Amino acid sequence: MRMCDRGIQMLITTVGAFAAFSLMTIAVGTDYWLYSRGVCRTKSTSDNETSRKNEEVMTHSGLWRTCCLEGAFRGVCKKIDHFPEDADYEQDTAEYLLRAVRASSVFPILSVTLLFFGGLCVAASEFHRSRHNVILSAGIFFVSAGLSNIIGIIVYISANAGDPGQRDSKKSYSYGWSFYFGAFSFIIAEIVGVVAVHIYIEKHQQLRAKSHSEFLKKSTFARLPPYRYRFRRRSSSRSTEPRSRDLSPISKGFHTIPSTDISMFTLSRDPSKITMGTLLNSDRDHAFLQFHNSTPKEFKESLHNNPANRRTTPV
């Protein structure tokens, strides 16, 4: 199931990378970002405000040029003049900087470049050995491309809005499909970047878990059983040994002493209570002890007097 999920994620990354790059390239290269009314012919010194309003026609514009849709100049395109002479702005104002950024279109171009490198990283991840590192690079490229794209869109909207204080001079306009292609490219680029980073994190966690398990297998400590298990094995082995069933020296000493010795060495408190049975028992035990003590002595003397057991020294 996890391999299927990873295959789906790689498919989303590949298709999304191609879609984001294609949409942004089309958006930058086409002239349908904005629909508005404007004058298509070249301005002259004799033009006044009334004549210019009468000659305004529907136009569509992109990042660098404007094309006419109506009138005698239908289909004619001209370069956008971001710094007209009759515009009342100063070169050190924020509007001038906004126009400069809008004229350069640096952020859309940067977005296309980053998307291109991100697509190369996604393609290289299919053949490179350390594919998880390449996928991480692709994710970084796509996230950066999306941020550059949204900054360019914000700058474009701000440049078209003009001065908020001049509501009357504000013209009616609407955004075209090229603008929406750029917006969709931003969304897809961010999704692809997040999925690529997620693939890298998941792969990194798997590699880390695999290396950790291999380290535990190779370590000598992992080969030994746990302390409790070893303690139980030792206790069980000791209990199964025949020596463990023997009596202790203290218990042996107590059990080897005959009961007659105890009765022989104990003194009665009252001599009148001594009966004939106890005297007979003591005489019998005394005779047994004399026989027991004399037997080893006679056995040793017989062994010593036996000529076969004598040690001879060769001459």
UniProtKB/Swiss-Prot annotation:
Gene3D superfamilies: 1.20.140.150
Keywords: Calcium, Calcium channel, Calcium transport, Ion channel, Ion transport, Membrane, Phosphoprotein, Transmembrane, Transmembrane helix, Transport, Voltage-gated channel
GO CC terms of this entry: AMPA glutamate receptor complex; dendrite; endocytic vesicle membrane; excitatory synapse; glutamatergic synapse; plasma membrane; postsynaptic density membrane; Schaffer collateral - CA1 synapse
Modification type Phosphoserine: residues: S248
Subcellular location: Membrane
Stretches that traverse the bilayer: 8-28, 104-124, 135-155, 181-201
GO MF term (any one): voltage-gated calcium channel activity
One of the GO biological process terms: neurotransmitter receptor localization to postsynaptic specialization membrane
Pfam family, one: PMP22_Claudin
Membrane topology designation: Multi-pass membrane protein
Subunit structure: The L-type calcium channel is composed of five subunits: alpha-1, alpha-2/delta, beta and gamma. Acts as an auxiliary subunit for AMPA-selective glutamate receptors (AMPARs). Found in a complex with GRIA1, GRIA2, GRIA3, GRIA4, CNIH2, CNIH3, CACNG2, CACNG4, CACNG5, CACNG7 and CACNG8. Interacts with AP4M1 and GRIA1; associates GRIA1 with the adaptor protein complex 4 (AP-4) to target GRIA1 to the somatodendritic compartment of neurons.
General function of this protein: Regulates the trafficking to the somatodendritic compartment and gating properties of AMPA-selective glutamate receptors (AMPARs). Promotes their targeting to the cell membrane and synapses and modulates their gating properties by slowing their rates of activation, deactivation and desensitization. Does not show subunit-specific AMPA receptor regulation and regulates all AMPAR subunits. Thought to stabilize the calcium channel in an inactivated (closed) state.
Family from the record: Belongs to the PMP-22/EMP/MP20 family. CACNG subfamily.
UniProt-recorded name of the protein: Voltage-dependent calcium channel gamma-3 subunit
Organism, as annotated: Homo sapiens (Human)
